[in-house]
Every structure is written in structure tokens, then in C-alpha cells.
Amino acid sequence: MSSESPQDQPQKEQISNNVGVTTNSTSNEETSRSQDDNVKEVNGNDDTKEEEQEEDAELDDLFGDDNDDDDDDDVKKSETEKSDSDSDEDDEGENINHRSRHRESLGLDDDEAEEQAMYTRKFYGEDANNFSDQDETTHTFKEENVELVRHIIPSKANVNETASHNEIFYARIPNFLTIDPIPFDPPSFEAKVNERASNSASREDQLDDRLIDENTVRWRYSRDKDQHVFKESNTQIVQWSDGTYSLKVGEECTDILVNDTSNTFLTVSHDQQELIQCYEGGEIKKTLMFIPTSTNSKIHQKLSKAVIRRNQRQSKGPGTYIVSMDPEVEKKELERKQSQILRDRRRRQLKEKEKQESPDAAFETGFRKQNSPTTYGASRRNEYEEDDFLVDDDEEEEAAFDDEEDDNEEEEEEEDADEENASRLRNLKREGAAMYREEEEEEKDRSETKRRRVAVIEDDEDED
């Protein structure tokens, strides 16, 4: 039991309340302190993060960042694409303006401008339309020192230049004439001749090579008295007083026949541009033909001998055989010919036997009939022995049997014909022998009468 008064109780409650307030205030202060600590910790973490980001930024400034590089590349690509598209549009516009200015300067309409563009593509390629004046600055040029051989203009004779001397002639080179387009060089020519002489074993080949060398048109560079260089040739074309021409190669002359021609032009072909360009007018109105002066000339005799040697060599060479028949058909034909040869041989043997036999016909026929089956059987056995193949099919066997029967009939007919011929021959022999005996007897009688007359004449002379 407590001895406290009611006045003391409210004081206690007030104290307790104050104590509670103080406790609450102290707890609030503690929470606020904890929150302040947390805020300080968060602020501290933020400060560390900011410091780390600043350090990373400094490193990125030194070494660069991958993400920044990718971003920069994307930005650059977009900028270049925009610039390329803008430049293409500008180039197209400039090309159109350039073509329009070019068309206006030439005074061409649309059709003529298209035709002109086609020709420019033919000459300069497919990229000629994209060419402009500003493109010249973008091209790169390279320089190089090149030595070009400058050929001398061919010399002309000092004649009056008329229309006849300025014409172009077309000449077909004959077989006995050769043209060497390379300038003549004595050392190289001697080396070539020695090489051919060492390689060619036969004298005929050497003669042919010499004939070619003697009838070759050559030229070389030479100098005159004033040391002026000019072209010199071993060939000349001579015009005689009657208007005819001759070709002089070395010491040999060849006649030239001049004929008229038409629809012939001398041109140079440009394959890439698909064009043909004429040379100095290009029209050819005359043709030349080279023929030997006579059959007694040296060149004609040498050519004829060379042709004869070539024909002889060709005739001595191996011949060619062209197969124009089926091998199976050819084989059957050869077999048939072989069987015919055997039959002819048997016939000759029979005739020889008949000649050797006696004139008695009965005896000969009987002897022949006795011997004929054996010879016939032997021949048939030989035919079977000479057969090189076997027949398995029944139809082929029947066909072969029919062929054998036909052969037998033919052989029998041939034998009968041979017998008839033999009998005729014997009769002719008998008749000839009888006639020969009669002639001998008549000659004997004549000789006896002559002898008698001679003897009688001699006796008369003795008596006188």
C-alpha cells in the first residue's frame, strides 16, 4: 500500500510524462543522428563515385573509349554518306549541265546529241559520258622516258609526179619470190646460212635454201657521200620506153603484167572502235603479176628443177590409204576371192592330170571317176579344216548346210564342164595328130619324088 497523496499523483504523472518526452526526444535525436550518418555515408559514396568517374574520364582522354570510338565512327559514316550523296547529286547535275552546254555550243538537237554520244562511247569507252572538266584535276598522270625508233620515209625516184605515179598497186607475191621486211644485217644473215647448212644434210635442201635467198627482196639503211641516211634495196622496178615494167632482183629480171581492177581498197582496221580507215584515198585501181621473162632464164630453170625434186620426194614418201568399205564386207569379199582361187587351182590340177593321162578315153574317164570322190572329199575336208569359226545357232547351221549344198552343186556343174572341155581337148589332139601324120606322109612322098628326079638327072649326065 502506498502512502502517497492525490496531489502527489499528478506530479508523478507529469514527471513520468516529462520522462517519456525526454525519452522520445532522445530517441528522435538518435534516429536523426543515424539518418545524418546514413546521409553522410551516401554522400561519401557519391563523392567516391564522382572521383572514380573523373579518373575514368582522365584515362579516356589519354587512351580513348571504345564506345566513344563507335559513336564517332557512326557519326562519320553518316556524314560521309550524306556528303557522297550530295556529291553524286552535284556530279550528276554538273554532268547534265556540261552535256547541255556542249549540245548548245554545237547546236545539236536531241537525236543528233544521242548519235554524238554513241560515237563518243565508241571512241572513249562507256565512261565517256561521266567525264567532265572538273574530273581532269582528280586524274593522276605518270611520266616515263621511252625511246621511239623514228623510221625514215621511203625514197622516191625523181620523176614528174603525175596521177599515174601516185597510184597504189596490188601485187600477189608468187611462190618464187620472197620479201624480208626486216632490215638486212650481214652478220645475222651469215649466221642463219651457217645454221641451215649444218642442219640440212642433203644437197637438195641446200639448193632450195639458196634459191630462196637469191629471190628475196631485201632492204637496208645506207649513207650517201654527204652522210645522209637513206633506204637501199636490192630490188628495182624498171619502166621501159614502151610502157612495160620489169622487176629486177639482183641480176635476174622478171616481167610485170599490169591489169585494171575495181572495188579494191587499202585500209587499216581498228578492232576496238569497229572502224576501217583508208590509207591515202585507199582505192586500188591496178594489180601487178610477176612472171619469168622466158623459159630459158636462170630463175625459170632453177624453179623447174626445184619443182621436179619436190615431186620426186613426194612420190618417194609413204602413201595414204583411205578406208571406204565396211571391214566385215571386205572380209567376206576376201573369203569369196580365196575360195575362187582354190577352185581355179583345182581346175588347173585336173587339166594337168588329163594331159598326163593316156589317150584312151574309157580308161581316162574310169580312172577319173574312181579318183574324183577321194579328191572331192579331201577338198571338202580341207575346207572344214580351214574354217576358223564355230556356229552354235541352228539357223546358222541350216544356212551353212544350204550353202554347202549350193557349193556342191556348183562344183559338180563345174566338174561336168571340165570333163566336157577335157573330152573336146582330147578330140582336138587326136585330130591334130592325124593331120600331122598325113602331112608328114605327104612330105615324105614329096621328098622321095625329088630324090628320084635328082637321081635320074644325075644318071643322064653321066651317060652324056
Curated annotation (Swiss-Prot):
Major localization class: nucleus
GO biological process: chromatin organization; DNA-templated transcription termination; positive regulation of transcription elongation by RNA polymerase I; positive regulation of transcription elongation by RNA polymerase II; regulation of transcription-coupled nucleotide-excision repair; sno(s)RNA transcription; transcription elongation by RNA polymerase II
Biased composition (Polar residues): 1-15, 368-377
One GO location term (cellular component): Cdc73/Paf1 complex
TM region positions: none
Family the entry assigns: Belongs to the LEO1 family.
Role noted for this protein: The PAF1 complex is a multifunctional complex. Involved in transcription initiation via genetic interactions with TATA-binding proteins. Involved in elongation. It regulates 3'-end formation of snR47 by modulating the recruitment or stable association of NRD1 and NAB3 with RNA polymerase II. Also has a role in transcription-coupled histone modification. Required for activation of RAD6 ubiquitin conjugate and the BRE1 ubiquitin ligase which ubiquitinate 'Lys-126' histone H2B.
Complex and partners: Component of the PAF1 complex which consists of at least CDC73, CTR9, LEO1, PAF1 and RTF1.
Name of the protein: RNA polymerase-associated protein LEO1
Species annotation: Saccharomyces cerevisiae (strain ATCC 204508 / S288c)
